Regions:
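Surface-exposed peri-terminal alpha-helical interaction modules
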Residues: 1-257
Length: 257
């Protein structure tokens, strides 16, 4: 799948910088408001076994307007919302659904294609595009990061993802320094002093990453995460619960994916 987005080689940063992902659309139309309301209500709808009922009530032409009006940032937000709703729909009942209804499948697949991604809950949608700062004046750290959307909610799910947000932020310097080394070699300017400086930055960045990893057990119980949270992020290809894959209604000639 070819992405429509272009890497700016003049500004290589990490996967998470100081700029927060978009949390809400402004001046929402009725479909955009419905999408946001449903995505925000996922924990309550899963608790009451109403998620499929609410989504099945949407019309087949839900969110059928032109995607060209959205910026990349807005498309990434929409992809987060559709991804969470799709996975909640498939896995949010006693048995997984073999078919994803057209109201979610069609716009989700189009948005994902526009972003150059498969229509699945990816790490980008689950983590990289799914957080905000509690206090805008503070940095990206475990005391100041919260999720925008989740499945069941609760400390274990939120902590698991916010740890990864902060890990990606801590790894920024390693990515920038790695790129700096590559550029130095390409320009035949990879002196010992440049290599030492950038490799030292990479080491310091990885030390911060490891420090954050060690904090995972503080607020994320492995049993709770594995049995209550993780099932919602499963894919479907070769999954025992959906051995033939998932049918995206109205997409891919309705062949299981």
């Amino acid at each position: 799948m070819k992405s429509n987005l272009i890497l700016n080689k003049d500004h290589v940063d990490g996967f998470i910088g100081e700029t927060q992902p978009l949390r809400y659309l402004e001046n929402k139309n009725s479909d955009e408001q419905t999408l946001e309301d449903l995505a925000c209500a996922i924990p309550k709808l899963l608790l009451t076994n109403k998620i499929r009922h609410q989504i099945d009530a949407l019309s087949d032409d839900f969110f059928s307007h032109d995607l060209g009006k959205y910026s990349e940032t807005e498309l990434r937000l929409l992809n987060v919302q559709f991804s969470f709703l799709a996975h909640a729909y498939v896995w949010g009942d006693l048995a997984p659904s073999k078919v994803l209804c057209k109201a979610i499948a069609l716009p989700w697949s189009k948005i994902s294609e526009q972003l150059g991604r498969p229509a699945i809950l990816s790490y980008a949608s689950y983590c990289l595009d799914n957080w905000h700062k509690i206090n805008d004046d503070e940095g990206v750290n475990l005391d100041n990061v919260a999720l925008n959307y989740n499945f069941l909610g609760g400390i274990d799910e939120d902590w698991f993802v916010t740890i990864h947000v902060c890990i990606e932020h801590a790894a920024n310097q390693a990515i920038k320094s790695s790129f700096a080394i590559a550029c130095a070699y390409e320009a035949n300017q990879a002196s010992d002093s440049i290599l030492l400086e950038e490799l030292t930055k990479i080491k310091e960045s990885m030390l911060r990453v490891n420090h954050l990893f060690r904090k995972m057990p503080e607020k994320c119980d492995p049993y709770i995460y594995y049995h209550r949270v993780r099932p919602y992020i499963f894919g479907w290809k070769n999954n025992p619960g959906l051995p033939d894959g998932l049918i995206y209604e109205g997409c891919f000639d309705e062949k299981p994916q």
